C-alpha cells in the first residue's frame, strides 16, 4: 500500500500540482500586498484621499440594535486582487504557449540527416529493383 501511494505521489502531475499550489499561494500574497499597499493608496489619493479598504455602507434597521454594514471597499479590493491574479496567469500561460510553439516549429523545421549507411542501403535497394525487372 505504501508503495502504491509513493508511486501515485511521485507522478509528474501530482508533484506539478503541489508545486503550483504552493507557488500560487505565495503569488496570491504578493498580489494582495500590491493591491493593498500600492494600488489602493494611489487610487485613494487620486480620488481625494478615499481609503477603499474601510469604505462601507451602514444600514440601521428598525428593530435591530446592531447596524448592518456592507463592506464594499473590501469587495472592490478583492475584485482588484482577482483581476490582477487572473491577468498575470493569462500572461504567464501565453508566454509558455509561445515557447511551446517555437519549440514545435524548430522540431518541424529539422530535417533528419541521412547517414552514409542509409544512403548505401538506398542505392542497394534501387540496384536490386532494377535487377529484378
UniProtKB/Swiss-Prot annotation:
Key words of the record: Cell membrane, Ion channel, Ion transport, Membrane, Transmembrane, Transmembrane helix, Transport
Subcellular location: Cell membrane
InterPro entries: Mechanosensitive_channel_CS (IPR019823), MS_channel (IPR001185), MSC/AndL (IPR037673), MscL_channel (IPR036019)
The keyword Isomerase belongs to this UniProt entry's keyword annotation: no
Single GO molecular function: mechanosensitive monoatomic ion channel activity
Top-rank lineage group of the source organism: Bacteria
Membrane spanning stretches: 8-28, 30-50, 73-93
Pfam families, A to Z: MscL
Predominant place of localization: membrane
Membrane topology of this protein: Multi-pass membrane protein
One annotated Gene Ontology cellular component of this protein: plasma membrane
PANTHER family for the chain: LARGE-CONDUCTANCE MECHANOSENSITIVE CHANNEL, MECHANOSENSITIVE CHANNEL MSCL
Family stated for the protein in its record: Belongs to the MscL family.
Function per UniProt: Channel that opens in response to stretch forces in the membrane lipid bilayer. May participate in the regulation of osmotic pressure changes within the cell.
Subunit structure: Homopentamer.
NCBIfam families cross-referenced by the UniProt entry: mscL, PRK00567.1-4, PRK13955.1
The protein's name in its UniProt record: Large-conductance mechanosensitive channel
Lineage: Bacteria, Bacillati, Bacillota, Clostridia, Eubacteriales
Amino acid at each position: 500500500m505504501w508503495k502504491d501511494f509513493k508511486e501515485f505521489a511521485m507522478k509528474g502531475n501530482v508533484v506539478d500540482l503541489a508545486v503550483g499550489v504552493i507557488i500560487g499561494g505565495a503569488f496570491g500574497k504578493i498580489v494582495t500586498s500590491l493591491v493593498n499597499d500600492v494600488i489602493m493608496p494611489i487610487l485613494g489619493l487620486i480620488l481625494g484621499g478615499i481609503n477603499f479598504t474601510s469604505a462601507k455602507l451602514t444600514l440601521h434597521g428598525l428593530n435591530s440594535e446592531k447596524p448592518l454594514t456592507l463592506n464594499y471597499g473590501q469587495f472592490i479590493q478583492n475584485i482588484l486582487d482577482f483581476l490582477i491574479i487572473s491577468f498575470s496567469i493569462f500572461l504567464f500561460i501565453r508566454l509558455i504557449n509561445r515557447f511551446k510553439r517555437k519549440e514545435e516549429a524548430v522540431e518541424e523545421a529539422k530535417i533528419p540527416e541521412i547517414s552514409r549507411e542509409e544512403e548505401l542501403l538506398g542505392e542497394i535497394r534501387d540496384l536490386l529493383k532494377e535487377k529484378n525487372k
